[in-house]
Amino acid sequence: SVSINKNIPVFGGLGGGTGNAASILKVLLKGKISKSLLNKAESIIGTDLRLFFWNQGFLSNLKNITYFRKKKLFFILVKPNIRCSTKEIYSKVRKYSKKQLLSQNKINTKNKFINVISQENNDLQSIVEKKYPIIKKLLIAIRDEKGCCFSRMTGSGSVCYGLFKDQITAKKALNKLKIKFPSFWFSFAKTV
């Protein structure tokens, strides 16, 4: 029996439940799974299970991510009052963009790292923006906050985030956004 206490919002695109399930499956199945079992598990657990099982998330192509964990970055996370269906959003993707190969040798400063990740995109974001215009409005509001390096939607939505280099600036932006969007869920996070 496994019990998970989830302290993040459901339907946020943060992959909490699915990511935890994938980790447990990986251990139980010793990292090996047939395509048919994976398809069956996805129908029960979540459409994005294979991304977590095969470590296909953002920055997964870096061999040693420890270096990047030392870079102190700060995030504000905002979830509007909408529920994005992961299955529905993924079903509308026609083509995934090719991810760039990242070299730790070329990304050796915080600014270079931020520049590289700001060039990446979320293939699901435009789909969600069309269905829920508030996502685009929220992303613009976050991006326009002083000190925000860039804003983006997480996973299949609906949580949006902004990346900041400075904790004080990020917290000020968070407080301003809470006034603009009082009914939304908010959180502050930092790299560990």
Can you name each region flagged by the protein language model?
Residues 1, 27-45, 166-177:
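Phosphate-handling active-site elements
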Residues 1-12, 29-36, 75, 79-82:
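ATP-binding N-lobe of GHMP and related small-molecule kinases
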Residues 12-41, 51:
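DPxDG-like acidic metal-binding loop motif
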Residues 16-17, 153-158:
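Glycine-rich beta-strand-to-loop/alpha-helix junction loops that act as flexible
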Residues 52-150, 165-178, 183, 187-192:
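Conserved, helical-rich catalytic subdomain that frames metal- and/or nucleotide-binding sites
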Residues 161-163:
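Short hydrophobic/aromatic beta-strand micro-patches
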